[in-house]
């Protein structure tokens, strides 16, 4: 028996057995081997977007509980290493996109434990650029090439402010975006931003922190300026309302010709006297230098005896005219539109066209009230729309109207929506004026406070439709081929009219047969509303199909829609009610803009807004009136008083 015990003890010593049963038998305390560490994988960034055929995206992964440091294997849409259809990812996590657009999933899987992985959504866009106001000549406000921002991913946990780009003054222009641009020998996605200090900036659209590529001032000697020239002091042109304060330089959104890498932009400035200058510039996208015989000093004269006329002609006045509407590029011609500064007399609405290839060549001049006055083309910064034939469509605000008269003068178009031919010069070929035009003008409830949107061609009813609306809150659905002119008794000559909002200072958006509008007049508020269009009837349901819980104070919001074709529609809108002096909604105070995202299938569903996150994580710069969001390649850009703010999927 003693020999058996000694033998067992010797076996315990020699074998060093660690099982509970043997330790107990050997007279030791029970011990257990600790379990292996739990494997966990994380991926960075948590979502991304690239341009097809140009950008790459570097992913990294961290594996906890991997003592042998075996790392990860990479796949795209479940395909190890990916392929040419979904994109290729290297062993180091560098993703190279396919040549076609789409949404993909990049996955990092632990080698130590293949059941553990982490994934990130990967959007690949084929968007060729945002080269003009509201995306296209229809001014429908839709980017249907957005494959990174989805209704599932735009929320406070995964979406927010990425970075800001500081600028020298307020940004009233919409941000424009160009992909794959060679600047100083390197390819960048680039955003272009203009300010009221007459500055123009090019920034890398993706780099955080912000990377400035170049900056020019449009009134220096290299850009046609004279000695001592400055941006315009607000009090030198206004009536004391401080609508744009404290300086006026570039107000209208530029336009880009991507085929020549040229940006066209309007500047306003003054020098001692004061003497006022308005110039159209043609700027090289890669350097900021002038080209195409630019700049050109704006000057024009039309026949007429209207306000400010001399003899039998009306001349363009560089002091009183204000290029508020965005520029349009149509068939090789750049068109600029004007109204007034704070209704300072005398003024007219003007449209002037210049050859995009030679700015010294003026190709068309149109005045909305050559024998009257107080007309203007404001459209809350919206651009003239244009159809496939090159016709321009604009809405005018207030002023003289006599186009319905059978005898001359009958060329004044106050409170009208116009079709203007560009075939030879500029001439009105059709128009619509509401039956209460005189009342609109008398009460300053002008039609032209809102922009014009062209609807897609229809297969039932009139094939060519447009939407126009103003301060009265009525939307007019008009047949572009037969606009209806003026009818004193009613507006029955047009396709449809209905009260849609509190008053429009916006350009509407139209996506998947839904119209989006957030309108509000001074002192009022209204919700973002969506109206359904019935293509078989060729008309709108006059009751909103959905509306937001948030109510937008004056001036409402011009929306933009991003989507992946017909899916993942998101409506973006900026509350700019605290835009500063005079901002009736905020008692003249200036406060941050608030960017909102809504589900485009029902705007009653708010996905996110920039005031939600704690510690002001997503707070924008101080608001500017009529700001339009630009969505491109997984990011949203908005201009403010001192910076451009960039939002996207959080890293």
Residue ranges and their predicted role:
Residues 56-62:
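A short beta-strand segment in extracellular, disulfide-stabilized domains
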Residues 66-82, 119:
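Short, well-ordered beta-strand segments
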Residues 102-113:
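A short beta-strand micro-motif common to beta-rich folds, especially ectodomain repeats
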Residues 2-14:
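Bacterial N-terminal signal peptides that target proteins for export
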Residues 126-421, 426-458, 463-485, 505-531, ...:
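Mobile, glycine-rich extracellular loop/lid and propeptide segments
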Residues 20-44, 114, 119-122:
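Bacterial Sec-dependent N-terminal signal peptides
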Residues 89-102:
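Extracellular/luminal low-complexity segments enriched in Ser/Thr/Pro
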Residues 49-55:
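Short, solvent-exposed loop/linker segments at the N-terminal edge
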């Amino acid at each position: 028996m003693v020999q058996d015990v000694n033998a067992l003890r010797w076996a315990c010593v020699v074998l060093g057995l660690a099982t509970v049963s043997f330790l107990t038998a050997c007279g030791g305390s029970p011990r257990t081997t600790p379990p292996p560490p739990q494997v966990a994988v994380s991926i960075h960034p948590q979502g991304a977007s690239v341009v097809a055929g140009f950008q790459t995206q570097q992913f990294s992964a961290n594996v906890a509980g991997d003592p042998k440091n075996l790392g990860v294997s990479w796949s795209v849409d479940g395909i190890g290493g990916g392929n040419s259809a979904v994109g290729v990812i290297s062993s180091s996590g560098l993703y190279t996109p396919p040549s076609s657009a789409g949404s993909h999933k990049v996955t990092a899987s632990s080698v130590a434990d293949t059941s553990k992985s982490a994934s990130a959504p990967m959007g690949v866009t084929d968007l060729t650029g945002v080269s003009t106001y509201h995306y296209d000549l229809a001014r429908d406000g839709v980017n249907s090439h957005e494959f990174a921002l989805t209704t599932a991913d735009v929320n406070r946990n995964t979406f927010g402010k990425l970075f800001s780009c500081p600028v020298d003054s307020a940004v009233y222009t919409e941000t424009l975006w160009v992909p794959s641009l060679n600047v100083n020998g390197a390819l960048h996605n680039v955003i272009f931003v203009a300010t009221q200090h007459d500055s123009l900036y090019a920034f890398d659209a993706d780099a955080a922190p912000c990377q400035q590529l170049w900056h020019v001032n449009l009134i220096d000697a290299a850009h046609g300026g004279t000695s001592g020239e400055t941006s315009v002091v607000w009090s030198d042109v206004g009536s004391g309302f401080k609508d744009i304060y404290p300086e006026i330089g570039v107000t209208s959104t530029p336009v880009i010709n991507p085929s020549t890498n040229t940006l066209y932009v309007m500047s306003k400035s003054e020098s001692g006297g004061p003497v006022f200058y308005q110039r159209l510039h043609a700027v090289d996208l890669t350097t900021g230098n002038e080209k195409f015989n630019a700049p050109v000093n704006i000057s024009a004269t039309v026949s007429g005896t209207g306000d400010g006329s001399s003899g039998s002609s009306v001349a363009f006045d560089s002091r009183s005219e204000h290029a508020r509407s965005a520029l349009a590029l149509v068939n090789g011609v750049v068109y600029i539109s004007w109204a007034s500064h704070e209704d300072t007399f005398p003024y007219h609405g003007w449209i002037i066209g210049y050859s995009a290839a030679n700015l010294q060549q003026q190709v068309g001049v149109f005045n909305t009230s050559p024998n009257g006055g107080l007309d203007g083309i404001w459209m809350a910064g919206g651009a003239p729309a244009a159809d496939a034939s090159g016709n321009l469509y604009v809405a005018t605000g207030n002023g003289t109207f006599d186009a319905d008269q059978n005898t001359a003068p009958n060329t004044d178009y106050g409170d009208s929506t116009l079709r203007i031919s560009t075939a030879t010069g500029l001439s009105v070929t059709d128009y619509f004026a509401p039956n209460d035009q005189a009342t609109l003008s008398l009460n300053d409830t002008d039609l032209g406070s809102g922009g014009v949107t062209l609807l897609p061609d229809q297969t039932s009813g009139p094939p060519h439709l447009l939407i126009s609306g103003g301060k009265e809150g009525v939307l007019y659905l008009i047949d572009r081929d037969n606009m209806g002119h003026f009818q004193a008794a009613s507006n029955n000559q047009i396709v449809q009219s209905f009260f849609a909002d509190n008053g429009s200072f916006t350009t509407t958006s139209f996506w998947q047969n839904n119209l989006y509008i957030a309108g509000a007049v001074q002192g009022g508020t209204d919700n973002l509303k969506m109206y359904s269009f019935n293509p078989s009837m060729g008309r709108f349901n006059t009751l909103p199909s959905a509306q937001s819980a948030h109510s937008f104070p004056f001036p409402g919001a011009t929306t933009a829609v991003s989507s992946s074709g017909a899916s993942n529609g998101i409506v973006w809108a900026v509350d700019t009610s605290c835009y500063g002096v005079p901002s009736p909604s905020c008692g003249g105070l200036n406060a941050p803009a608030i960017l909102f995202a809504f589900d485009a299938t029902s705007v009653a569903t708010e996905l996110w807004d920039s005031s939600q996150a704690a510690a002001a994580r997503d707070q924008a710069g101080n608001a500017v009136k009529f700001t339009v969001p630009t969505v491109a390649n997984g990011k949203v850009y908005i201009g403010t008083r001192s910076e451009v703010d960039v939002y996207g999927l959080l890293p």
